[in-house]
Amino acid sequence: MSQFASAPLRIAALIERIGRLARAREAATLAPAQWEALRFLARANSFSRQPGAVAAWLATTKGTASQTLMALERKGLIRKARHPSDGRVTRLEPTAVGLALLEEDPLHGLVEAIARLPPLHAAALSQSLAHIAGDLAPEGAKPVFAGCAGCRHLEAGGGVSRCRNFGADLSGEETTLACVAHSPAEV
């Protein structure tokens, strides 16, 4: 029996191959973890643009994430700022240079390939991969990193969205960005 006879093994090998093909397009200017951190910061909400959230997204230690963030800061791709209401909190923002680099993101090739899938296939793939990612995440550290839709913390009404977890009003755009505190609403 071939080592690729089982469907789960074939799928795992394909996922790994897709990852290698996508990483092969990455410019030498950034390491893979740096690309991932920069991508995350560009699509995360303001509550999630913090070193701990980046570490959770990268599934690494805070120390390793800190090294990645320092490299991005040295390259002028992100900047650190203190939170306006809590000076103990560090907020991370992509710079104009960082956002411009993302326009040349090597991941665009993979995004375009996925965009060519029939919508039902893309939806099924997204749901399946999210389930697999959830299963692989360390127990007790399973941030979903989704927008506000379907989150138990979202309080919406009267044209205003509010996050009960952070006790803050949210702009329309903010509700669509990745959040480290997303917790699926009970159905």
Residue locations for each model-derived region?
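Long, low-complexity, charge-rich intrinsically disordered regions
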Residues: 154-187
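N-terminal helix-turn-helix DNA-binding core of bacterial DNA-binding proteins
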Residues: 23-61
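Charged, amphipathic alpha-helical coiled-coil/dimerization segments
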Residues: 71-123
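Pre-recognition alpha-helix immediately N-terminal to the DNA-recognition helix
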Residues: 10, 17, 36-40, 100, ...
